[in-house]
From Swiss-Prot:
Belongs to the class-II aminoacyl-tRNA synthetase family. ProS type 1 subfamily. SUPFAM superfamilies: Class II aaRS ABD-related (SSF52954), Class II aaRS and biotin synthetases (SSF55681), YbaK/ProRS associated domain (SSF55826). Its EC number is 6.1.1.15. Homodimer. One of its GO terms (molecular function) is ATP binding. It comes from Salmonella arizonae (strain ATCC BAA-731 / CDC346-86 / RSK2980). It holds the Pfam family tRNA_edit. Catalyzes the attachment of proline to tRNA(Pro) in a two-step reaction: proline is first activated by ATP to form Pro-AMP and then transferred to the acceptor end of tRNA(Pro). As ProRS can inadvertently accommodate and process non-cognate amino acids such as alanine and cysteine, to avoid such errors it has two additional distinct editing activities against alanine. One activity is designated as 'pretransfer' editing and involves the tRNA(Pro)-independent hydrolysis of activated Ala-AMP. One of its GO terms (cellular component) is cytosol. One of its GO terms (biological process) is prolyl-tRNA aminoacylation. It catalyses: tRNA(Pro) + L-proline + ATP = L-prolyl-tRNA(Pro) + AMP + diphosphate. It comes from the Bacteria. It is found in: Cytoplasm. This is Proline--tRNA ligase.
């Protein structure tokens, strides 16, 4: 490709509304342009990267035995009503009616459509297992699209769905997809972790997320410094303290704390160690409970894990925090003065709280706290559960090493769905025993557009993008200095351009009448891995300058050797 016949569209300045580096660089490198909130046009440079990601995904899906299909973006509402998600899904589901007043949705995912296809096409266990995939546009009406294509409303996704007559068969495909995903992200040159995850709104049993490590990531991922243990922070178990609870050394005392409505204020005003404080959070209880609320207690320096809390049997799902009005109606005190002593609602405490002695907590009286509280002396030990987020330095749940926490960008997610959708849509086949058998499902997704942004978040410097070779828009940039004034520079540039293309190498030759500084800046901004610079001065010695984008190293290569040098560097 020649720049004179190409839409380069680079920008010198960073657009003001671009918050994260991937959004900034995708705009500056001329990869995308915003059409409306959460909607982007992919320009040629961006589309080349997107297609490379898509091709790697497709190759590995095919290698893993998945079968490609293509399903409509527009889906009839009756399928969503049949599955029960018409009511469950929030405003992210874009609903509309056609000219015949028939309701439809723009698909955010395709479980209903593929299950409907399978229930109509398959009839016998002999046809299974099958794993279908597509690379298709999705639409989710995000309330606040942000970070460019990282959290857009329209995006490209690879979604796959497998169907089985046994858990063993599902596990086999799940393991194959886990391995395929690991190959996909390894081939793309990404630093990633596969982590245990919560199944979320899609539902089901086992689940793993594939997270690209990046400072701008929205997720906290947890992994051991010794073993292979890795989990999303929502799921990571906080091990109970191994040391026994210390004996009481203080009497419980009621203290006036009129200006301490938060843990931070309590610690500052009374010079307390934060690990000797407890915070109490009130949430809604399940329907038909004797009490409308449940009290959840975590240590002052810990955070409540809302996913764990929501799974407690007496806590309503979705987790809903009580309002101040609801709290006062039951406790007769405000949120800043709550604690376990004389608490009139059921109490659940975190494992770390159960190991505390001589601690401070609200007295359930406005402006007052108890100091020196001890379990079983001042208040009975309530139900104990793991309800907090782990913190760096906690012991790893597998007993090997301690935990590290890093930020991650979720680029893939695999689920064992079980029979959630097949039961709702009555997708069954005749089993080996001749009886009707409901199918067991797996679900496997990759955010194709998100992968592009995640790769940039991991691969950039002060000059622009530093693409991994496998997904770079071009492999080689040819920069002929003053080619419009030097016949030998132009002649050699054209010769190398043809020879490299004949070797199957993707080349961008900058044949614009631009200053060298502009040419260098543009090629570094868009992140082409290998650059050759052809100039009269080096040609006097039969040399060409080669520069590797990732390291910035430069070297002089003889003109007769440069093609072989590049082929070896790219293809190995």
């Amino acid at each position: 490709m020649r720049t004179s016949q190409y839409l380069l569209s680079t920008l010198k300045e960073t657009p003001a509304d671009a918050e994260v580096i991937s959004h900034q660089l995708m705009l500056r490198a001329g990869m995308i342009r915003k059409l409306a909130s959460g909607l982007y046009t992919w320009l040629p440079t961006g589309l080349r990267v997107l297609k490379k990601v898509e091709n790697i995904v497709r190759e590995e899906m095919n290698n893993a035995g998945a079968i490609e299909v293509s399903m409509p973006v527009v889906q009839p509402a009756d399928l969503w009503q049949e599955s029960g998600r018409w009511e469950q899904y929030g405003p992210e589901l874009l609903r509309f009616v056609d000219r015949g007043e028939r309701p439809f949705v723009l698909g955010p995912t395709h479980e209903e459509v593929i299950t409907d296809l399978v229930r109509n096409e398959l009839s016998s266990y002999k046809q299974l297992p099958l794993n279908f995939f597509q690379i298709q546009t999705k639409f989710r009406d995000e309330v606040r699209p942000r970070f460019g294509v990282m959290r857009s409303r329209e995006f490209l996704m690879k979604d796959a769905y497998s169907f089985h007559t046994s858990q063993e068969s599902l596990q086999e495909t799940y393991d194959a997809m886990y391995a395929a995903y690991s190959r996909i992200f390894s081939r793309m040159g990404l630093d990633f972790r596969a982590v245990q995850a919560d199944t979320g709104s899609i539902g089901g049993n086992a689940s793993h997320e594939f997270q690209v490590l990046a400072q701008s990531g929205e997720d906290d991922i947890v992994f051991s410094d010794v073993s292979d243990y890795a989990a999303n922070i929502e799921l990571a178990e906080a091990i109970a303290p191994q040391t026994p609870r210390a004996a009481a050394t203080q009497e419980m005392t009621l203290i006036d704390t009129p200006n301490a409505k938060t843990i931070a204020e309590l610690v500052e005003q009374f010079n307390l160690p934060i690990e000797k404080t407890v915070k109490t959070l009130l949430v809604k209880a399940v329907k038909d409970s004797k009490s409308p609320l449940v009290a959840l207690l975590v240590r002052g320096d810990h955070e409540l894990n809302e996913v764990k809390a929501e799974k407690l049997p007496n806590v309503a799902s979705p987790l809903t925090f009580a309002t101040e009005e609801e709290i006062r109606a039951v406790i007769n005190a405000g949120p800043g003065s709550l604690g376990p002593v004389n608490m009139p609602v059921p109490v659940i405490i975190d494992r770390s709280v159960a190991a505390m002695s001589d601690f401070a907590a609200g007295a359930n009286i406005d402006g007052k706290h108890y100091f020196g509280i001890n379990w079983d002396r001042d208040v009975a030990t309530p139900i104990v559960a793991d309800i907090r987020n782990v913190v760096a330095g906690d012991p790893s749940p597998d007993g090997q090493g301690t935990l590290l926490i890093k930020r991650g960008i979720e680029v893939g997610h695999i689920f064992q769905l079980g029979t959630k959708y097949s039961e709702a849509l009555k997708a069954s086949v005749q089993g080996e025993d001749g009886r009707n058998q409901i199918l067991t499902m797996g679900c496997y997704g990759i955010g194709v557009t998100r992968v592009v942004a995640a790769a940039i978040e991991q691969n950039f410097d002060e000059r622009g993008i530093v693409w991994p070779d496998a997904i770079a828009p071009f492999q080689v940039a040819i920069l002929p200095m003053n080619m419009h004034k030097s016949f030998r520079v132009q002649e050699l540039a054209e010769k190398l351009y043809s020879e490299l293309r004949a070797q199957g190498i993707e080349v961008l030759m900058d044949d614009r009448k631009e200053r060298p500084g502009v040419m260098f800046a543009d090629m570094e901004l868009i992140g082409i891995p290998h650059t050759i610079v052809i100039g009269d001065r080096n040609l006097d010695n039969d040399d060409i300058e080669y520069k590797y984008r990732r390291s910035g190293e430069k070297s002089l290569i003889k003109t007769g050797d440069i093609v072989d040098y590049l082929v070896k560097a790219i293809k190995g």
